[in-house]
């Protein structure tokens, strides 16, 4: 019996058999301006000749799976002959779902996995639980950790003790990668070029040039300087999808600091946008979202827990999710949490080598556990007892 592990994120699906490597694939469908009638699914995005004005059709809205038609088509593609050629009669699945997921969504997922695809056994679990499992496996002496999962739709902060989540201390911040990309689109559209339709391109810009400032006001001052002294400023060459397929940053020595470029390249000049956008993760109130930033929320979450456990959480803070890849993210989280924490506590912030696939790797480890059979719901169980058996088994 093989096990398929699917970390079903709102932006990317991380998928692979437990005995193989993981693939990271867009969990959505696309339509392009040029081929209006054709819908591209998942990694077929690579086939689109001109991805400007790319239109996204997402199965998730505000972090919850609501568009089942799209999700089904993406899964059909992933499980089908193009990708994983799943033999449902001989396959179990570990699949992730968001925290505090709605019962109606859980029931739909049970029905689709058991009745339509007919997997032999299912384990439905939060991505954070998989990350915690991986962390405890790497650090067997630790009993507690706090998982910071900063993804596409939100950032969740979840303490785990002996692999059980502490529900009373879970915090959600409504800031994720989608909001950052949208904010960057608005700033660039207001200041330079109209890019409101260019989600795909601007998302790439964000990933290529943005970083987390260690000293916001100092970087702001540098960004105001003229010419050579402005070390923050960068010129980004936008793709034209004929000669330049993917945007890139101009090397510092090739930048024309005054006047125009001779070549016909389309250039975005970015200065304070580079760090002002990720800053929203630390100060959501900058754009009118009245919520705590990540470091403050970590401390607040830990302070909701029994005092004797708190030191164990402060020294096991684990960062996962795509936003933790911003340069400087880990250092900033560490320095701010350190400032907010009593001096007699140790603080340690861990950024795994690949924070995007960390939860998937946890799922792979769980599938190899001796007690894996006790965690799943088998198809016989489901056919006999329906949704109630899933509710009892899965601690969501």
Swiss-Prot record:
One of its GO terms (molecular function) is nucleosome binding. The modification N6-acetyllysine is found at residue 260. One of its GO terms (cellular component) is cytoskeleton. It is found in: Cytoplasm, Cytoskeleton; Nucleus; Nucleus, Nucleolus. One of its GO terms (biological process) is nucleolus organization. Disulfide bonds: none annotated. It holds the Pfam family Actin. The keyword Nucleus applies. The modification N-acetylthreonine is found at residue 2. Keywords: Acetylation, Activator, Cytoplasm, Cytoskeleton, Nucleus, Repressor, Transcription, Transcription regulation. InterPro entries: Actin (IPR004000), ATPase_NBD (IPR043129). It comes from the Eukaryota. Its main location: cytoplasm. Required for formation and/or maintenance of proper nucleolar structure and function. Plays a dual role in the regulation of ribosomal DNA (rDNA) transcription. In the presence of high glucose, maintains active rDNA transcription through H2A.Z deposition and under glucose starvation, is required for the repression of rDNA transcription, and this function may be independent of H2A.Z. Belongs to the actin family. ARP6 subfamily. Component of the chromatin-remodeling SRCAP complex composed of at least SRCAP, DMAP1, RUVBL1, RUVBL2, ACTL6A, YEATS4, ACTR6 and ZNHIT1. Interacts with CBX1, CBX3 and CBX5. This is Actin-related protein 6. It comes from Homo sapiens (Human). The gene is ACTR6.
